[in-house]
Amino acid sequence: MKLTRLRLHGFKSFVEPTDFMIEPGLTGVVGPNGCGKSNLVEALRWAMGETSHKSLRATDMDAVIFAGSGNRPARNHAEVVMSIDNSDRTAPAALNDADTLDISRRIEREAGSVYRINGREVRARDVQLLFADAATGARSPALVHQGKIGEIIQAKPEQRRRVLEDAAGVAGLHARRHEAELRLKAAETNLTRVEDVIGQLSTQVDGLKKQARQAIRFREVAAKVRKTEAMLYHLRWRDAQAEVGAAAEVHDLGVRQLAECTRVQAEASRIQADRASTLPSLREAEARAAAGLQRLINAREQLDREEARAKERVVELERRLTQFSSDVAREQQQAIDADAALERLDTEDVELREEILERVEKRSGVDERVAEADASLGEAEQLFAELTTQLAELTARRNQFEQSVRTHRDRLARLDTEIKNVESEIDRLSAETSGAGDLTELAEAVEIAQELLAEQEGAVQEAEAAQIAARQTLDGSRAPLVDAEKKVQRLETEAKTISKILNGETKNLWPPIIDGITVAKGYEKAIGAVLGDDLDAPVDPSAPMRWTDVGVQPEDPALPEGVEALAQHVTAPPELARRLAQIGVVTKERGNELCEQLKTGQRLVSLDGDVWRWDGFVASAHAPTGAARRLAERARLTDIENELEQARIEATAKRQALETAEADLKMAAAAETASRESLRGARREVDAARERFAAAEREVNRHAARKSALAEAQSRLATDRAEAEAALENAEAQIADLEPNTEAEARLAAVRGDIDGRRRIAAQIRAEAQALAREAELADKRLQAIAAERMDWQKRKAGAASQIATVEERVAELTAERAELENAPEVFAEKRSAVITEIEFAEADRRAAADALAAAEQAMSETDRLAKASLEQLSSAREACARAEERMEAARRRLEDVEREIRDMLEVEPQAAAQLAEIVEGAELPPLAEIEESLDKLRRDRERLGAVNLRAEEELNEVETQHGTLAAERDDLVEAIKKLRTGIQSLNKEARERLLASFDVVNGHFKRLFTTLFGGGEAELKLIESDDPLEAGLDIIAKPPGKKPQSLSLLSGGEQALTAMALIFAVFLTNPSPICVLDEVDAPLDDHNVERFCDLLTDMAKTTETRFITITHNPITMARMNRLFGVTMAERGVSQLVSVDLQGAVDILDQNVA
């Protein structure tokens, strides 16, 4: 089987249809980083059945579809097609009829992948097994993607065993063994569940047998209860009728008494109405008299209030006049005060203006004295400044020399300290350097941590694989569960529909006999045609039309010879036994022949529904009757219930499988999380070991550099100390050469005293000038205040005159009002006398009206008493009548309740209860209490039976049938498990034989290839960790030229890469794969090793039929290829493929040279 072409369309960056030809020899793929070279490898693996989107560098499987670019829209599908040359007919038998196999995988966005081989849709598993049998596949070591060399180097020995399995060609056996193990596990699970169900069914059979016996006893007790209930209800109905008659007689007597009381009450009401009509006019007259009297009393009270208000007004006027006199006196005094104040302010104004003129003359002389004092002080201060400058210069020089001396002394002291510190630091570094850690031990610790890291990475890969497998198992468990639940739902819906139809047809008082018939399948039309509407009749004795049990009689004629009775195919109540025994089942042809042999009452019927009767009546088959349809539906309902039970069992099993898969996925996820946490810990340990090694190395380098710097500092400090000593001696000599500054300080002190005297004089003169200025300012402010105060007093004087005029006007008004009020008492006395006279007359009228009203109300009260008494008698009569009517209605309701209970409980009319109780007319009946006691006893007997399953016999037959079916299924499962276990053992045996046979061959090729690639040295493969080759790990022991033997992880990067390549090529020589892809495996190699690598590739291409595809950036590797494909990205986000046939170019060049 040879791969010849790979066609991509819409896969990742290859948006346009692209053909990648895979020809014999070496094919190179080159191009810049990020242009899509690795997409070719991923397309090849994807078409071989890769299921992990992570290994394809995608966020999900839809991410392999072209997602669009700046100028290209996204695609909705992607497709990769591989063409395989099958001319040697090495494909599986089902596909071995074609010379060329086109294997395609197409994915629609959000719709999943579809696999096809030569246009026929197949499973992903079929494609994976096809490539696994050919020693290749999506996870084959022959497809060496970026980082694959590193994975082989870092892999655990158990993981490297996969290389041997590919060499032995047992990958397909592993897949088949895994599938068989899954089937074995499922079969064992099903066997356990079947055995559990069989045990449950056995328990149910025992229980149903007991329930069937209870059902028979229950029916007997129920019949007695029904008869006793009928007698009890009959007695209650008879008593209720008698109670209704007695209540009716009492009610008629009450009605007559009510009529008499109604007449008496009507007469009393008439008299009451006549007397009540005279009261309104008397009440109105009394009210008018009382209103007139009240109006006069109110007038008298109003007159008193007006007189009091007049007196209060006179007192108020007197008080206000007195107040106005005080206000006028106060305003007059305020005008006098204003005149005096204005005169005082004029005098003060004149005096202040004279003082201001005197101060102006005095101020001019003081200003001249201030100018003279300032000039004298300025001359003295200038001389003081000159002397101060001279003394400061002298002092500054002295201070400078003294500071220089102090500075040099401090420098000497600091240098001495630094010299001591440098010497101490040199001694300390010598001690620390002698105690520094051994870098070799730290390097070994780094290697140990790296080995642990490699083990943890292997554990993480195993956990990821386990999680992927668990997720695949979970995904595979969902679809069967959905199908099973849909099947259960469909069967439940059909069963409910049929049950509803059957129940809707039997909603009558007596269930028809058809409900008790069970017909063998295929005989529904026959029994429906021959019995027809007779099947709708019940067997209940109380029904007006019913079947009765007369039994098969000995004198009944036998059916014609060779005719089979319908009773043999029908299970029916005994009431139908005689009828069914006289009905024969024949074919249509025989029916026509035998119809003349029928005796009285006999019938023949065909399975299609043709009927022949003894009296010559013949009915041809027609559409199924209602009874036939009903029987068919009941048969179908039974089949559905059986199917539904099995479907529920299957759904439960699949649900448990899904739950188990979910639990396995959770465990796998937890294991992956734990392994990743361990990996992170191992990485932290590696980083810590590397950091410790780097820190120790940095510390050693720092000590060496520090020692060199301290030696330089020691030499520099010695030179600086000598310079500091010389500078100190020079500064001390300069201080000795300076003259003393005593004379300059004395002259400066004399000038300072003269300046202080002149400053005091100038200050006194300035203080005198400032006092004069302040006095002038105060005088100006006082003149302004006098002007404002004069204006205020003038306003007050004008206001007082105005207020006096206003008050005098108000006094005149109040005096006039007081004069008017002086005559008010005489006027009020006259008015009061007139009102009192009118009040006396009004009181006499009111008393007369009140007396007349009281007499009328007394008579009315007596009339009301008589009317109330008659009304009470009428009310009592009505209540008595109502009670009688209520008792009569209650008796009728009780009668109706008894009749309704009879209809509900006995399902007969009340008149038929006696017949149901088998009561003979005129017979003496037992007391009601005795019947109730007997009924209670029967009911207790029925209740002691508890919940009774009336369908126990039918359920018993169904469960026994299920038990037999499951027992047969259990035997089949046991046999299948034996076959599966035998098959798994056979596969394991074959895999071990192949693996051991290929190990020696691979090991021999590996030794030879290792020596070739390294130019010497030794290497070998070892099976470790287990005696079973299927569980053992593969370890690599290598000894490059000039080194001791060591494991793969301790080699250098280039050596590891060459060793891994030797292992991969050894596998090729053992079981050559149709294709080998090497994705930048030459990246860690130097030019010399690249030459060796290319020599080996060339040799492999010649000695095997494997077709090599090499993705590289190395120009040496490019030059050794037979052909090159270039991957470019001229348009952003879109890859294009171009090819160059290097061998053809060389041939053309050779021809031109020749």
Swiss-Prot record:
Q: One biological process GO term for this chain?
A: chromosome condensation
> What broad class describes the main subcellular location of this protein?
cytoplasm
Q: Which CDD domains match?
A: ABC_SMC_barmotin (cd03278)
- Pfam annotation, one family: SMC_hinge
Per UniProt, which keywords does this protein have? ATP-binding, Coiled coil, Cytoplasm, DNA-binding, Nucleotide-binding
Could you give one GO CC term from the UniProt record? cytoplasm
> Where ATP is bound, by residue?
32-39
Instruction: From the Swiss-Prot or TrEMBL record, state where the protein is found.
Output: Cytoplasm
SUPFAM superfamilies, alphabetized: P-loop containing nucleoside triphosphate hydrolases (SSF52540), Smc hinge domain (SSF75553)
Q: Carries keyword Cytoplasm? A: yes
Keyword ATP-binding included in the entry's annotation:
yes
Residues annotated as coiled-coil are: 170-215, 282-505, 627-993
Q: Which GO terms describe its molecular function?
A: ATP binding; ATP hydrolysis activity; DNA binding
Q: List the disulfide bonds.
A: none
Task: Present the record's domain note.
Answer: Contains large globular domains required for ATP hydrolysis at each terminus and a third globular domain forming a flexible hinge near the middle of the molecule. These domains are separated by coiled-coil structures.
Q: What does this protein do?
A: Required for chromosome condensation and partitioning.
Subunit arrangement? Answer: Homodimer.
Q: Which family does it belong to?
A: Belongs to the SMC family.
Record protein name field:
Chromosome partition protein Smc
Species per Swiss-Prot/TrEMBL record: Rhodopseudomonas palustris (strain ATCC BAA-98 / CGA009)
